[in-house]
Amino acid sequence: MVKVYAPASSANMSVGFDVLGAAVTPVDGALLGDVVTVEAAETFSLNNLGRFADKLPSEPRENIVYQCWERFCQELGKQIPVAMTLEKNMPIGSGLGSSACSVVAALMAMNEHCGKLLNDTRLLALMGELEGRISGSIHYDNVAPCFLGGMQLMIEENDIISQQVPGFDEWLWVLAYPGIKVSTAEARAILPAQYRRQDCIAHGRHLAGFIHACYSRQPELAAKLMKDVIAEPYRERLLPGFRQARQAVAEIGAVASGISGSGPTLFALCDKPDTAQRVADWLGKNYLQNQEGFVHICRLDTAGARVLEN
């Protein structure tokens, strides 16, 4: 039996639309991510468990974990009969890389079960392909950090899909999921087809400056440059209370904030534990909309997806 855990991730990080993402893990030790178990069997089966299992498609072939198994078998050129279990702990359409968690855990578990026949680069390429089936286009800003850990910059040149960017140990990521769903496809459809030249220049300056600040170890500058001119101005209308929440967390002391992925989760970066706690308390009282919502104080998950049992 192989059991793999894949952590939540926050894509875009305001400054890097479709090219930046960070894996996150709660400071209290909770597992914020999906778990997939693979066992040898006579025929294929898939069992869904976990807090959000009831939100998964009722037709097994529509389940992304089934599609991962099917695509992995196709890659190897043979059928591999296994019993798979998906522990769906991540809300769907949350902006926390929910589908990436399932895809990464499923493909990594299959690869481990088969003796690591695929290398990490090929496996990551498959992860991007499968994630693209849900979001509508291939992009790696959730699957890469989820699989490899840390903060990842998408490269997609010279056979390199992504590379790690150094993060800051003092940064605490407060993630508030309000309990409503925003589909990635819907959040993409709302974006303009073309952008003004000054917005393109600002975006390039912010992203280049952010990467420079990370490598030159300037956390204050890095946080200051986490601005979004590409997606947030258009997507915030999909998120009730988002603008007020951003203003409130800034007043409390967050050094940066924005939409996690395509939303509705809000992320707020803090550089002090007491500030993070006050931000989390405010968001818990004011940004959550129902019982399915939650707030976690997180750090970067530098390990990425990992085998829990083998």
From Swiss-Prot:
GO terms for cellular component: cytoplasm. Pathway: Amino-acid biosynthesis; L-threonine biosynthesis; L-threonine from L-aspartate: step 4/5. Keywords: Amino-acid biosynthesis, ATP-binding, Cytoplasm, Kinase, Nucleotide-binding, Threonine biosynthesis, Transferase. One of its GO terms (biological process) is threonine biosynthetic process. It is found in: Cytoplasm. The keyword Amino-acid biosynthesis applies. Its EC number is 2.7.1.39. Catalyzes the ATP-dependent phosphorylation of L-homoserine to L-homoserine phosphate. This is Homoserine kinase. It comes from Escherichia coli O81 (strain ED1a). The lineage of its organism: Bacteria, Pseudomonadati, Pseudomonadota, Gammaproteobacteria, Enterobacterales.
